[in-house]
Amino acid sequence: MSNTVWILISILLATVGAVVGFFVRKSIAEAKINGAANEAKRILDDANREAEALKKEALLEAKDEIHTLRTEAELEIRDRRSELQKQENRLMQKEENLDRKDETLDKREQMLEKKEESLVARQQQIEELESKVGELVQKQQTELERISNLTREQAKSIILGKVENELSHEIAAMVKESEVRAKEEADKKAKEILSLAMQRCAADHVAETTVSVVNLPNDEMKGRIIGREGRNIRTLETLTGIDLIIDDTPEAVILSGFDPIRRETARIALDKLVQDGRIHPARIEEMVEKSRREVDEYIREVGEQTTFEVGIHGLHPDLIKILGRLKYRTSYGQNVLKHSMEVAYLTGLMAAELGEDEKLARRAGLLHDIGKAIDHEVEGSHVEIGVELATKYKEHPVVINSIASHHGDTEPTSIIAVLVAAADALSAARPGARSETLENYIRRLEKLEEISESYEGVEKSFAIQAGREVRILVKPDTIDDLEAHRLARDIRKRIENELDYPGHIKVTVIRETRAVEYAK
């Protein structure tokens, strides 16, 4: 019974609690709803107020922007109106200018029409005058022909002849003046170049002989050199082609011969025989052959050394060997190899001054006398032989022409060829370069004066400057100026044909007229 009551009471209390909780929750919910509604209303009111403010602000901004745009539009319209006004003014001004130009052109056209009418009238007047002048000229020509007995063509020919003669004299005078001026300038420049080349080129005074001396340890060696019945000396002379002179000269044997290479071969062979002490025909033959090989090798070395000193490269080996043989060749006592090197240096220096190829100039100068190395072995002049050698070994055409023209046998085709000829003459003619015997020297001077004085009208002649110039004084009553030129040419030809001399000889004919009066 009590449990049931308690259950009922519990149920009742639970029910009452549920009802009370329901109402409490309801009241709380209503309160929340009311608060939310109030909050929503407040938010809505705030939003409405903010929207109203934004609306007002937007309206104000829109009004400001509309005002700004309106102002800019008005300014742009004003500017466009101003620009249009300016364009309109310019167009009006151009129109006015065009109107003025039209007026000016109309005036000019009228003036041109007037001038054209005037020119037509003048042309008619000129034609009338020309017709009258032509008639007058024809009358004058007819009258002149009648008076002078000359036709128009004859008179024209005479006048043209006089004019041509006057012009030819004037042209000749101008040409002569130009030639004199050019010659003076060329001579001055040539002297400067030659002086510079000579100052920069140091050359030796050359003196060569045709004999060699072999020193002996004692005079008993002379008998051994001669051998039994002279067989040793005959063998040596036969193999070398050199004369052995054994005289009273103590402890010396003289080798005489005009071929320096054979003389050098004999000297070396005899030196070796004397040092060896075994002198008999077989040994002599062996030593001579060995000496020939040594001389050939020495000649090759000399050729190579020469090309190195001169600064030339690319020569054919055979040509180098032939070049070395020039060491044993002389011309009027001047060593040909030294002479060729001197010509090479001079040609190179002058070519450098003129802006030509210096190396090619040196090459041409060094090889200009290459034919002299074998001219005693091959038929022909040294110029012809040199040209053949240069052609055979494919030298430069300028080098070949320089060899061919350095003695005037052919015309030079390049400046270098002319320089080679000048350097050759300069090297040969300088003092001390070439030598002659005293007898030949005196005989040549006497012959120079004899040739000069053999002509009629020559008063006296003098050979000066060691025979390199001859001055001839002539009688002015017998020889005039033109005859003096002819006399100089004739004497020059006779000297070239009758005398043998190194370098050049200058022939000067002097004609002097003196007028003397005495005042009393």
From Swiss-Prot:
TM region positions: 4-24
Record-level GO cellular component terms: plasma membrane
Cell compartment(s), UniProt: Cell membrane
BP GO terms, sorted: mRNA catabolic process
Coiled-coil segments: none
Recorded family membership: Belongs to the RNase Y family.
Name of protein: Ribonuclease Y
Gene assigned in the entry: rny
